[in-house]
């Protein structure tokens, strides 16, 4: 009979530390994706690792209310509250999409007390890409 090989550093022996507690990033990037149906706010560190995120759906808004400016404002406030507690002071803002929550999310970010380096619109624009559908004849 062979003896089982002892596991070195198994989960029971080692202490698992969460990444959220160790994050002390003074600078971050706030990504706002505003579609017509929802607004998603993601806060990352400069390397692109997600520190915090929130959306209008996770804030409790259902159906068509997720696309409203108030829902976007609430989502931005929830996402930023967590990183302000961790010590974030400066941020860059990237806004993507045509939704109603663009301006409301930006106002909530400005009100949170984080200093903004710049605000950039990164909405993808086609350079005459796909052919549009044919015109409707009614």
UniProtKB/Swiss-Prot annotation:
Q: What are the disulfide bonds? A: none
Region annotation (Disordered) maps to: 1-22
Keywords for the protein's UniProt record, in alphabetical order: Chloroplast, Plastid, Ribonucleoprotein, Ribosomal protein, RNA-binding, rRNA-binding
InterPro entries found in the cross-reference section: Ribosomal_uS11, Ribosomal_uS11_bac-type, Ribosomal_uS11_CS, Ribosomal_uS11_sf
Q: Which GO terms describe its cellular component?
A: chloroplast; ribonucleoprotein complex; ribosome
Which NCBIfam families does its entry note?
Answer: PRK05309.1 (NF003698), uS11_bact (TIGR03632)
Q: Which HAMAP family match?
A: Ribosomal_uS11 (MF_01310)
Subunit composition and interactions: Part of the 30S ribosomal subunit.
Write down what this protein is called: Small ribosomal subunit protein uS11c
Q: Which organism is it from?
A: Nymphaea alba (White water-lily)
